[in-house]
């Protein structure tokens, strides 16, 4: 087996550095409140505009979203909402009484849900309706959505339209740790989130992990991983899309491409991000064997 390309490994020191950065930021925001958030928004994202967007501002920003894009987002929002509502309706409340012991199950939505939608490197439109529409279907009375300023401006128009369509009650132009802290501490809206959901980089993930206990979270997510095995008949576009679909989650999300020849590799690599480790083997081992060799933590 030979390597056609190798990606650098992530140093453990990077994780420790992220923990320290997040700890310091959360402490500063907890102490100085909204002003600290504004300072971080300007320092990290170059944003000095309104944090909490009004309905008229949202309408203005989304006015030029192409109709075909609106139609696609409308369709996606409805699909997610319909499924989530059916899922919610399939879970029933019940009450039992046995030998003097009463027990049961009640379904109560949280009061406030915070939905984080990253747009730092890519505009994750799907993250908007997957979180907000689901919360809406669950019956959450107040939904707060946050997204990073996009290219020095307010929230990406497509993402903002998705937030609006999915049913966000409050929208804040905030990204990163300052967004997570603002939702957890109830800054700008006066509503403290009971749960915070949504993907993000290592700083966002660390902020959610640190605040867990004060606020509920969906999951502490690490970097995504993907491994693709392709022979000479594989469609290079499909291979590239499968790789990018996971690696877009962050520049520390590794991707592996194993091929039986150089052909698929040479065609797929140019359309994939730089952080891809690629191995070409003359005789391809069985899939689970070769994957386990590189991903021992995921062994069956």
Language-model features and meaning:
Residues 167-254:
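Conserved NAD(P)+-binding/catalytic subdomain of aldehyde/semialdehyde dehydrogenases
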Residues 1-3, 171-175, 293-300:
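Short acidic-hydrophobic, aromatic-tinged amphipathic segments that line or gate anion-handling sites
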Residues 267-275, 280-283, 290-292, 299:
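Alpha-helix boundary/capping motif
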């Amino acid at each position: 087996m030979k390597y056609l390309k190798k990606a650098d490994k992530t140093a453990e020191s990077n994780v420790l550095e992220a923990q320290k950065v997040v700890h310091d930021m959360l402490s500063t925001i907890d102490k100085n409140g909204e002003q600290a958030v504004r300072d971080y928004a300007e320092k990290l994202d170059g944003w000095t505009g309104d944090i909490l967007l009004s309905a008229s501002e949202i309408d203005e920003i989304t006015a030029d979203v192409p109709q075909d894009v609106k139609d696609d987002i409308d369709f996606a929002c409805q699909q997610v909402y319909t499924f989530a509502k059916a899922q919610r309706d399939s879970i029933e409340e019940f009450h039992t009484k046995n030998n003097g012991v009463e027990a049961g199950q009640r379904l109560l939505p949280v009061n406030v849900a915070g939905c984080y939608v990253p747009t730092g490197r890519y505009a994750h439109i799907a993250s908007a309706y997957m979180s907000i529409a689901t919360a809406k279907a669950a019956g959450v009375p107040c939904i707060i959505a946050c997204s990073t300023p996009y290219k020095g401006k307010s929230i990406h128009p497509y993402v903002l339209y998705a937030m609006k369509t999915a049913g966000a009650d409050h929208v804040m132009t905030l990204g990163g740790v300052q967004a997570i802290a603002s939702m957890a501490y109830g800054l700008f809206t006066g509503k403290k989130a009971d749960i915070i959901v949504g993907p993000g980089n290592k700083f966002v993930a660390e902020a959610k992990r640190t605040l867990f206990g004060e606020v509920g979270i969906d999951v502490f997510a690490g970097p995504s991983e993907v491994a693709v095995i392709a022979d000479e008949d594989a469609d290079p576009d499909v291979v590239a899309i499968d790789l990018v679909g996971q690696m877009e989650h962050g520049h520390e999300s590794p991707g592996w491409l194993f091929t039986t020849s150089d052909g698929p590799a040479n065609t797929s690599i140019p359309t994939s991000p730089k952080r891809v480790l690629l191995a070409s083997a003359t005789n391809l081992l069985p899939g689970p064997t070769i994957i386990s060799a590189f991903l021992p933590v995921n062994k069956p």
